[in-house]
Regions:
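Extracellular carbohydrate-recognition regions
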Residues: 4-49, 237
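Beta-strand-rich interaction surfaces with strong enrichment in secreted/lumenal proteins
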Residues: 21-22, 77-84, 160-167, 208-209
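Carbohydrate-binding surfaces in secreted/extracellular proteins
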Residues: 36, 94, 167-197
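Periplasmic peptidoglycan-binding/tethering modules of Gram-negative envelope proteins
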Residues: 53-57, 193-277
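Short carbohydrate-recognition loop motifs
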Residues: 53-75
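Secretory/extracellular carbohydrate-interaction modules
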Residues: 68-150, 227
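Short, aromatic/His-centered strand-loop micro-motif at the edge of beta-sheets
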Residues: 148-174
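Periplasmic OmpA-like peptidoglycan-binding domain that tethers envelope proteins to the cell wall
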Residues: 283-350
């Protein structure tokens, strides 16, 4: 398959070992995924609606990215044809790059609002709000603030922990957000930055607001997904768990470090239920030849098995199979469909 999710640059902290305690697991029902690969440079992004400001598509080191110029700002929303698309339990992920020396900017502000406020810009109206400023610099901060329509309370900005500081140039950072009813968690790479437990219900839409200073900001791999129920409950009632959190390098079977959230979840499940046996199934989208996709998916399933065995799960409890593109669960004609089809499934076996 030609994976439309773009690779992230490796860093000294980006290793399977560094992510060994990572607990973020993406939602299992894709709502939105922005594949920019077919777009033209200097054009307005096709799948982000700009309420105010400036953003465009550019090529950076051979891949298409959402580009916010230096000394600019933009307020934008995902182009999703629903008045309200955020459920009570959901995840948001994207990769961000900025070489700015932090001095109040750059900043990303994420507003989660009631549907009737989806077109607001530069307003503190909403249900809750997440802010990232400075990213990996020594002065980087993050905040998760609960809002009461027009006022913000709680969740003052906190400085990045020292372990999350990474000042390397051209360094992609992975942002992750988990929301489940009144609980919210914010991550940068493998580090959890914030947690709150007083979110009020009613947020249905997302607004992204970004401001830059002397350097541009780049964003890619924007993904929104609805969260699933308890993993063991899904396995018993549905017979399988569909995982989108297990990620691989493009056209390879090498696990990305951020896969450890989903792998840790599966390890804990198998560790707690010692009689459980599963088949690990690799699945691809329909891009490329069926033979290549089948081999790739089989190798990826084996890579997941190898990691679980390394962590202490008996090999006899784990079977593997590569299905390639033979079992699609969505239409391969859309970015979201392709993303849904690129998955790892854990099936209960006797």
């Amino acid at each position: 398959e030609q994976n439309s999710e773009q690779p992230t640059s490796s860093s000294s902290t980006s290793s399977i070992f560094a992510y060994r305690n990572f607990d973020f697991v993406p939602g299992d029902k894709i709502i939105f995924f922005y594949d920019m690969s077919g777009e033209q440079d200097a054009e307005i992004p096709a799948r982000m609606l700009i309420n105010d400001g400036n953003a465009e598509i550019q090529t950076f080191k051979g891949e298409k990215v959402l580009y916010i110029p230096a000394n600019a700002s933009v307020s934008m929303i995902p182009d999703i044809d629903k008045d309200s698309y955020l459920p009570e339990q959901f995840t948001l992920e994207f990769d961000v790059l900025s070489n700015e020396e932090y001095n109040g900017l750059p900043v990303i502000e994420l507003y989660f609002r009631a549907p009737e406020h989806k077109n607001l810009s530069w307003s503190h109206t909403g249900k809750f709000y997440v802010q990232l400023a400075g990213f990996g610099t020594e002065q980087g901060t993050s905040a998760f603030q609960v809002m009461n329509e027009s006022s913000i309370y709680g969740g003052s900005p906190v400085q990045f922990p020292q372990a999350a500081v990474n000042t390397a140039k051209d360094n992609w950072r992975r942002f992750s957000l988990y929301v489940n009813k009144n609980i919210g968690k914010v991550y940068i790479d493998q580090h959890r930055l914030n947690i709150v437990n007083r979110i009020e219900p009613g947020a249905g839409v997302l607004t992204m607001e970004i401001r830059t200073a002397e350097h541009p900001m780049l964003i890619k791999n924007i993904r929104i997904a609805a969260g699933g129920s308890d993993a063991y409950k899904r396995l018993i009632t549905e017979g399988k768990i569909i995982s989108y959190g297990i990620q691989f390098d493009v056209n390879k079977a090498d696990l990305k470090p951020e896969s450890m959230g989903a792998i840790n979840e599966m390890f804990n499940l198998l560790n707690e239920h010692s009689d459980l046996k599963v088949e690990i199934g690799g699945h691809t989208d329909a891009t490329g030849s069926a033979e290549v996709n089948e081999k790739l998916s089989a190798a990826r399933a084996e890579a997941v098995k190898a990691q679980l065995v390394k962590m202490g799960i008996a090999e006899s409890r784990l079977a593997t199979k590569g299905y390639g593109s033979s079992q699609p669960i969505a239409d391969n004609a859309t970015p979201e469909g392709k993303t849904k089809n690129r998955r790892v499934e854990f099936k209960k076996i006797n």
